[in-house]
From Swiss-Prot:
GO CC aspect terms: outer membrane-bounded periplasmic space
Protein's pathway: Nitrogen metabolism; nitrate reduction (assimilation)
Designated name of the protein: Cytochrome c-552
Family (UniProt): Belongs to the cytochrome c-552 family.
Assigned EC number: 1.7.2.2
Phylogenetic placement of the source organism: Bacteria, Pseudomonadati, Pseudomonadota, Gammaproteobacteria, Enterobacterales
Residues the record lists as binding heme c 5: H275, C314, C317, H318
Positions contributing to substrate binding: Y216, H264
Binding, heme c 2: C160, C163, H164, H301
Amino acid sequence: MTRIKINARRIFSLLIPFFFFTSVHAEQTAAPATPVTVEAKNKTFAPQHPDQYLSWKATSEQSERVDALAEDPRLVILWAGYPFSRDYNKPRGHAFAVTDVRETLRTGAPKNAEDGPLPMACWSCKSPDVARLIQKDGEDGYFHGKWARGGPEIVNNLGCADCHNTASPEFAKGKPELTLSRPYAARAMEAIGKPFEKAGRFDQQSMVCGQCHVEYYFDGKNKAVKFPWDDGMKVENMEQYYDKIAFSDWTNSLSKTPMLKAQHPEYETWTAGIHGKNNVTCIDCHMPKVQNAEGKLYTDHKIGNPFDNFAQTCANCHTQDKAALQKVVAERKQSINDLKIKVEDQLVHAHFEAKAALDAGATEAEMKPIQDDIRHAQWRWDLAIASHGIHMHAPEEGLRMLGTAMDKAADARTKLARLLATKGITHEIQIPDISTKEKAQQAIGLNMEQIKAEKQDFIKTVIPQWEEQARKNGLLSQ
């Protein structure tokens, strides 16, 4: 305490001349300081943070692409009419953030800045260039327009300035200086009573991850990113919020249901689980302190599976050995996956049965309660499985959400059976062969050969133009 008082007196003594000067020369008001431009080139910070930089760069080793649609073709039906039915890979290293959003079939094959299916907001979790553009153009300026408009500007992979105040003197000295670089994330945290500036160090460590590893939607004409937390963070709270504002991400092309697509709600599910409730942060498990060759501790930025650094992560709290904990996690994962598949089977049938009812002349009023059940069932299923780590973060909450999803899907199918009977249809509705991704995509009418050909042309012609322009503008490290 004495040390704090001495520092305070010293600072005050240094400020006295400043106060005196401004009182005498009040008319000479200083111009506001120009904000320091966000530096998006991650390599810039390698000299001050060499270990962190090299470990971040090592996320390029996490290069495997896992096709989730090939593993589970039911997803194609659930997302019929939405870009996810074309292409959905499981996540890989941060070093591929820009590459993957460019190359996914979901972003289409735009020919110019005004072309393509998706908005600028789809860049928002991919690069520190997003923070740079928001600072430069404001949020409205950044979000305005199509995704392709950002191609020549958003070129550096998710990195330093996404989570750190890289312009601060403290960061230059090797301190972390965490920050929320996305203003919409800061507002969302305030909405749940967690203003970043007042949060403790452990809360802040998870909040910076929660800028991206969250559920969000595109709000208003400008398609700005917003987190649906106004009514709370549980699946029912967000469902209520979306229903209240009559929001939908798309309409399923089979059942004509206005649907919700969950993104990657790790922050919400972590908060609901035992680790979140005990403030065991994302950093504790995914970015542990490790030693470099000289024995100096640093935060490992090769974000990955905690079991890969068991001694520095799990073993800090748990007395069980690695094999025992892996067995527990595997069992939880299997339980969640088993229920996930059962819910998906019910939803696949519900979408095709709803299509049959519509084809038989069912009215909008007759379909409304059924579509509400389908919407809510699939939303709860999606929020449970879109967080790939829910079996670790909150297995009980995952099973609970899937259980309520199963109930809602069953309600929809019961109502559909009654409605179909009134239309003279009492036989079972046949489901086409969806045993592979390709067959499922054919069943919903996707011309995948054309979609893939257009994408390959885009990759070969448009992306090189973006990169050339970025280099000319000094946005990429040479």
